From Swiss-Prot:
It comes from the Bacteria. Pathway: Amino-acid biosynthesis; L-methionine biosynthesis via de novo pathway; O-succinyl-L-homoserine from L-homoserine: step 1/1. Homodimer. This is Homoserine O-succinyltransferase. One of its GO terms (biological process) is methionine biosynthetic process. It catalyses: L-homoserine + succinyl-CoA = O-succinyl-L-homoserine + CoA. Its EC number is 2.3.1.46. The lineage of its organism: Bacteria, Pseudomonadati, Pseudomonadota, Gammaproteobacteria, Moraxellales. Belongs to the AB hydrolase superfamily. MetX family. Substrate binds at R226, D355. The record marks R323 as: Important for acyl-CoA specificity. The gene is metXS.
Amino acid sequence: MSFPADSVGLVTPQKFQFEEPLHLECGRVLPRFELMVETYGTLNADKSNAILICHALSGHHHAAGYHHEDDKKAGWWDSCIGPGKAIDTNKFFVVALNNIGGCSGSTGPTSPNPENDNRPYGPDFPLVTVRDWVKTQAMLSDRLGISVWYAVVGGSLGGMQALQWSVDYPDRLQKCVVIASAPKLSAQNIAFNEVARQSILSDPDFHHGRYLENDSYPKRGLILARMVGHITYLSEEAMKQKFGRDLKSGKFMYGFDVEFQVESYLRYQGEQFSRNFDANTYLIMTKALDYFDPSREYGHSLTEAMSKTKCQFLIVSFTTDWRFAPSRSQEIVDALITNHKPVSYLDIDAEQGHDSFLFPIPLYVKTLRAFLGGEEHLKSTSLEAS
C-alpha cells in the first residue's frame, strides 16, 4: 500500500513495563502496570521537541499512521499528526499512549490480575482518575528521559489530562493545549454518563462485570451506551444535514425496526464500538470523567487551582459543541486571565459538534500549528530553558 505523503506511515506500538507499585487516588495499589505507546518523529538531542498526546474516552495509543499495509483506517488523530501537519512530525517527537484502565494494551480490566491467579481483573480493576493517568504519564516521561514536554495536547477527556498536567507538574510542560473540554463535568454530563453505565450494568450478560469468566459479553448494553454517547457528540445541525428525516427504505414500515437513517447510523456505530471496546473499561472511563475537578483541592476555586501553572495555554472550543459548550472553556480562560497567565482562546465556528476536535477544520489546524510553532521557536525556547 502507498501511504499519503503527509502520513507517518507504518508504526509499531511499544509496551513499557513498570514494576514499581502505583498508588491510586482511590486508595488502592496496582503492584505493577504496563503502558502501550506509539511515537512519531524523532526526539532531538536536548529532548526539547517532545509532545504528549492525551486521548479521549474511547481513544488509545494509535493516534496516527497505520499498523498494517492493508489498514483502511489511520490512527484516530491522523488528520493533525504527521509530516507537515499541525503537529508536524518533521519537527516534533510525538508520544501517544493508552491510559491504564483502557482496553488497547495498557493494564486494564482485561489484563491478568497477579493477585487472582492471573485471571482477568474484570470488575476488580480499581477506579482510576485523570490525576492517576497524569501520574503514569509522568512516569513514562521519566522512562523516555523527557524532563519537560514542549507541549501536552488533548481533546475532550484528553484536554482534562492536559489541564491536570499544568496543575500537577507545572515545571514539566512549556505549552498546554486544551480542546473541546471543561474544568469539570456538569450535572447533565454526569447524567448522560450514568445512563450509559446503567445500560451496561443492567445487561443480563454483564454478570457483575465477570462476563469474560462466564464466556459472555454485555453487547446490548455497550451498544446502547455508545448510542447515547454518540448523540451528545454530534450537533443538531450536523445530524440535520447528515440524516434529516430520511428513511432507510423511503417509506414508513410501521414497525420498531430501523426506519430512519439516523437510527441506522446509531445502531451501526454502537455495533462497531461493541466489537472493539471493553464494557468494564467504559464504566471506568466515564467515572474518571465524573470525578475530574482540579479545583476540588483548592476550595473549589478554579482560579486558585490555576494559580501555580507556568506554561502557555491554548484553549479551543467549538460553537456547536453542546457536550462541552464554549462557556466551559471560557471558565478555564477566565481563571487563567485572573491569574495573569499567558492564554490564547479561540471559539471556532464548526458544525460537527463535540466531535469537531477530530476534524481538520482549516482555522483549527492553522491555530494549532501557529501555537506550537516550528524549528525556530524550538531553538528559542531551548535557549530560554538553558
